[in-house]
């Protein structure tokens, strides 16, 4: 006698999707982080778009625009906090995803691993730009500290930092 989960039309779908899933036997919860990265990225893009609708580049009104988002925009406080905490969750998932790849030896697949490394650098550069560009003195501090690491490059480091800054120091809003 066959099991009902293998013969009933509706239960057969559930059986093939969850119980008899054609997946490796060593699959674990560590394999969820790639899809969680996609979800975090979608949340970041959507909340970032809504926050960008209220962006102002004037340094005198930048903090007023943040206050406006939190007080006057429907669920603006939620959008702002989802964007801020979503970035942290994104990087936690990213590092766990890389850790899973290291643990399971995915670095032996050179092409796939190298594309992942390139994507990691692209994500870091994008996060840096998102941190430095929009608002206030913390962005100036971030730009100064992070770009000063480039001054460690022999011969061209100092010139490179001044070129990125557009002068001898970061000044005014960086997005106009």
UniProtKB/Swiss-Prot annotation:
Cellular compartments per GO CC: mitochondrial inner membrane
Residues that bind heme b b562: 83
Keyword entries, A-Z: Electron transport, Heme, Iron, Membrane, Metal-binding, Mitochondrion, Mitochondrion inner membrane, Respiratory chain, Transmembrane, Transmembrane helix, Transport, Ubiquinone
Membrane topology listed for this record: Multi-pass membrane protein
Disulfide bonds: none
Necessary cofactors: heme b
GO BP terms, alphabetized: mitochondrial electron transport, ubiquinol to cytochrome c
Gene Ontology molecular function, alphabetical: metal ion binding; ubiquinol-cytochrome-c reductase activity
Xref: Gene3D superfamilies: Cytochrome Bc1 Complex, Chain C
SUPFAM superfamilies to which the protein is assigned, alphabetical: Transmembrane di-heme cytochromes
Chief location of this protein within or outside the cell: mitochondrion
InterPro entries: Cyt_b/b6_N, Cytb/b6-like_sf, Cytochrome_b_N_euk/bac, Di-haem_cyt_TM
Extra information: Heme 1 (or BL or b562) is low-potential and absorbs at about 562 nm, and heme 2 (or BH or b566) is high-potential and absorbs at about 566 nm.
Described purpose of this protein according to its UniProt entry: Component of the ubiquinol-cytochrome c reductase complex (complex III or cytochrome b-c1 complex) that is part of the mitochondrial respiratory chain. The b-c1 complex mediates electron transfer from ubiquinol to cytochrome c. Contributes to the generation of a proton gradient across the mitochondrial membrane that is then used for ATP synthesis.
Assembly and binders: The cytochrome bc1 complex contains 11 subunits: 3 respiratory subunits (MT-CYB, CYC1 and UQCRFS1), 2 core proteins (UQCRC1 and UQCRC2) and 6 low-molecular weight proteins (UQCRH/QCR6, UQCRB/QCR7, UQCRQ/QCR8, UQCR10/QCR9, UQCR11/QCR10 and a cleavage product of UQCRFS1). This cytochrome bc1 complex then forms a dimer.
Family indicated by similarity: Belongs to the cytochrome b family.
Protein name (database record): Cytochrome b
Source organism per UniProt: Sciurus carolinensis
């Amino acid at each position: 006698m066959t099991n009902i989960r293998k013969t009933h039309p509706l239960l057969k779908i559930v059986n093939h999707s969850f119980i008899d899933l054609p997946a490796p036997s060593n699959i674990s919860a560590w394999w969820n982080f790639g899809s969680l990265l996609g979800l975090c990225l979608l949340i970041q893009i959507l909340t970032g778009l809504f926050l960008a609708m209220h962006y102002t580049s004037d340094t005198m009104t930048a903090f007023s625009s943040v206050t406006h988002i939190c007080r006057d925009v429907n669920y603006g406080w939620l959008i702002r906090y989802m964007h801020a905490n979503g970035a942290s969750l994104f990087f936690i998932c990213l590092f766990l995803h890389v850790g899973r790849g290291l643990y399971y030896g995915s670095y032996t697949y050179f092409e796939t691993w190298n594309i992942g490394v390139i994507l990691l650098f692209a994500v870091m550069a994008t996060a840096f730009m998102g941190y430095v560009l929009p608002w206030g003195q913390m962005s100036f501090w971030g730009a100064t500290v992070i770009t000063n690491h480039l001054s460690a490059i022999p011969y061209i480091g100092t010139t490179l930092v001044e070129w990125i800054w557009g002068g001898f120091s970061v000044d005014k809003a960086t997005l106009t």
